[in-house]
């Protein structure tokens, strides 16, 4: 890899700034001038890439659907800021900033434009993604242990906690399948990631990891020679066995993990069902025609319930109404089509399907569309850029990644 060409490229600087921004509280104070400057840089690059993609490239349907999402959340986000209404998460008595809606959606969606454009212009390649896989894992570990330390410091009674970073680890899977062609490396890294997913004790992340493992096994048995099929099957069996053994270890040695398993078997969803019931009751019995069509505004679920819906479909329906649901359904229609369409590059198809599994499953039991980690969107933009025909627009030519 040519260091002068790749390490100091704008795409890599963007990632480094993103890492620095998400280390606020460790490297510098929360919401400091420096952190705001970092976020401003991210927004500047992201919106420039949004503009550049729309002006210079013939966009695939997936990117057009992302355009619709960005327009929708921008309108509702601006209205949220303009309204300046103070909303509280009653479950922990914390106020939600009026800018949080836009910040979360922008941090989640806009990096797709960055990776799409820089892939088209040759800055992001398969080798570059391979270079970043290990920093992604290291940074996820920093997030994991940082979260654990914070939870221990703020709670003197409990010694074990659920850790949302399990979702972050799981989002690195598509990058592994793009960056590494050797099967044994893929499976070792996948195993390492899944150990952290299980340790996080997030039931949704564990469920997604099981579905992902099933897909990885099926994919390894397709379109390969007999010898490769046996190797893939053997690696999959070892991977499942390793996950099972670690699951057993956690079950026997972690009281919290034991409780989480029992709650799952009993159908206890950590009050999520109660929130869903309250929001569904509102939509059926109390919502006006206007609110059914256009919603009650960004963060609207906090006006009805004591916390966010933790379900994209309910959250969007309450906040943005049927117009939001229609846009979101269209987004998923083209996402599925993008992931399932024939591709000459199997690793891109595998990465897209793993990304699709991760994001779609998460819509039902966690916030998904406004919480996609950059490890996922970085690869998602790359895959979409390389999963389209090589077209030019307004004399701008782009090149296929290595």
Q: Where are the model-predicted features located?
A:
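N-terminal signal-anchor transmembrane segment
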Residues: 1-55, 72-87, 140-148
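Hydrophobic alpha-helical segments of polytopic membrane proteins
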Residues: 3, 15, 172-249, 326, ...
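Membrane-interfacial loop-to-transmembrane alpha-helix junctions, especially the N-terminal start
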Residues: 4-15, 58-72, 124-133, 184-186, ...
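Transmembrane alpha-helices of multi-pass inner-membrane enzymes
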Residues: 15-19, 351-360, 368-402
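Aromatic-anchored transmembrane helix interface
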Residues: 36-47, 62-117, 137
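Hydrophobic transmembrane alpha-helices and their immediate junctions
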Residues: 67, 319-360, 380-386
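Alpha-helical transmembrane segments of multi-pass inner-membrane proteins
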Residues: 107-150, 160-219
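Long extracytoplasmic/lumenal interhelical loops at the membrane interface
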Residues: 266-320
């Amino acid at each position: 890899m040519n260091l002068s060409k790749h390490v100091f490229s704008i795409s890599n600087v963007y990632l480094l700034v993103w890492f620095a921004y998400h280390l606020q509280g460790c490297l510098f104070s929360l919401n400091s001038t420096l952190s705001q400057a970092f976020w401003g840089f991210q927004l500047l690059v992201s919106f420039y890439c949004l503009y550049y993609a729309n002006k210079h490239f013939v966009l695939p349907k997936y990117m057009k659907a992302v355009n619709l999402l960005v327009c929708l959340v921008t309108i509702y986000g601006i209205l949220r800021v303009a309204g300046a209404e103070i909303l509280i998460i009653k479950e922990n008595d914390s106020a939600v900033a009026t800018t949080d809606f836009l910040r979360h959606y922008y941090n989640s969606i806009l990096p797709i434009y960055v990776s799409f454009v820089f892939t088209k212009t040759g800055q992001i390649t398969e080798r570059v993604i391979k270079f970043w896989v290990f920093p992604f894992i290291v940074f996820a570990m920093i997030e994991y242990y940082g979260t654990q330390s914070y939870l221990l410091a703020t709670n003197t009674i409990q010694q074990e906690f659920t850790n949302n970073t399990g979702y972050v680890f799981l989002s690195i899977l598509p990058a592994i399948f793009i960056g590494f062609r050797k099967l044994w490396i893929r499976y070792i890294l996948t195993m390492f990631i899944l150990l952290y997913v299980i340790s996080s004790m997030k039931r949704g992340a564990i469920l997604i990891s099981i579905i992902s493992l099933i897909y990885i096994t099926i994919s390894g048995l397709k379109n390969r020679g007999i010898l490769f099929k046996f190797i893939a099957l053997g690696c999959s069996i070892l991977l499942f066995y390793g996950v099972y053994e670690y699951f057993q270890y956690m079950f026997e040695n972690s009281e919290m993990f034991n409780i989480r398993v029992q709650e799952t078997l009993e159908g206890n969803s950590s009050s999520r069902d109660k929130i869903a019931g309250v929001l569904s009751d509102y939509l059926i019995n109390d919502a006006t025609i206007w609110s059914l069509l256009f919603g009650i505004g960004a963060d609207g679920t906090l006006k009805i319930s004591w916390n966010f819906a933790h379900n994209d479909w309910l959250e969007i329906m309450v906040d943005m109404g049927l117009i939001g649901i229609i846009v979101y359904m269209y987004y998923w229609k083209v996402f599925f089509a993008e992931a399932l369409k024939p591709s000459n590059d199997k690793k891109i198809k595998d990465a897209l399907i793993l990304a699709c599994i991760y994001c779609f499953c998460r819509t039902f039991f966690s916030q998904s569309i406004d919480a996609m980690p950059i490890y996922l969107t970085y690869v998602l933009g790359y895959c979409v850029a390389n999963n389209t025909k090589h077209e030019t627009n307004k004399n701008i030519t782009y090149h296929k990644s290595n």
